[in-house]
Amino acid sequence: MPFEFDVITLLPDMFDAVTQHGVTGRAHKSNLYRLHTWNPRNYAMNHYRTVDDSPYGGGPGMVMMAEPLDKAITDAKARQGEDGVSKTRVIYLSPQGKRLDHKKVLQISQLDGVVLLCGRYEGIDERLIEDQVDEEISIGDYVISGGELAAMVLIDAVVRQLPGALGDTRSAGQDSHTDHLLEYPHYTRPEVHKEKPVPRILLSGDHAKIERWRLQQSIGRTWLKRPDLLAEKYPEGLPDREKELLEEFKQLRYRVVANQLMDNTKEQEQ
């Protein structure tokens, strides 16, 4: 059964970018998932199709009204039920939500479907959140104009985890954050670019050495850029093998930095 995304949004056309392009476009064409949009304006209570109003207590901006959203979510959940979806959640994309990470993406991908609620304006009537929303999710500590872009990020991340979505079944497993490690660097042709050659080991054909180098680079990059991930993966400290690889990475890095300093000094002397 395909994964079911039902999106509550005032801008349904935005999601054509998901269903028509790239990995998510191919997965949609292969019926690995289905995406339905529900426009709250179709549930508005007047002929102006009004879905927002001024906030009680005063203040700037407008607030999305509960009733049109409530009806849209109810219909979305009913449609999922008719299609056999038994495990689903209503997720509100909100800067107040828990930060989306790989663990959460995997949890969502194990469901049969989700209803994604995209807010606009100053926010959504709190009573709707209390009655209908199971979980709030944020894609970062910043504010964007609406929940649509955040919903598309979540959809893309979840679709990548669906069996058959990626051409190479190893791809999702090697992505950064999959194993609490950042991904190793990638290289392709030409062999030399602006006097910078591809690391010699990648041309050796020795797969065991290549895998070791890639693990070394993953550990080293994580140590440099996201040490918090290393602490999370190894709360009691690095195992001996990983510790050895990290020391090798540090030595290589220090050597590169030292050579660069020497080159800069020579240029200044000239």
From Swiss-Prot:
This is tRNA (guanine-N(1)-)-methyltransferase. It is found in: Cytoplasm. The keyword tRNA-binding does not apply. S-adenosyl-L-methionine binds at G119, I139, G140, D141, Y142, V143, I144. Its main location: cytoplasm. The gene is trmD. CDD domains: TrmD-like. It is an enzyme of class 2 (transferase). It catalyses: guanosine(37) in tRNA + S-adenosyl-L-methionine = N(1)-methylguanosine(37) in tRNA + S-adenosyl-L-homocysteine + H(+). It comes from Nitrosomonas europaea (strain ATCC 19718 / CIP 103999 / KCTC 2705 / NBRC 14298). Homodimer. Transmembrane segments: none annotated. Signal peptide: none annotated. Keywords: Cytoplasm, Methyltransferase, S-adenosyl-L-methionine, Transferase, tRNA processing. One of its GO terms (cellular component) is cytosol.
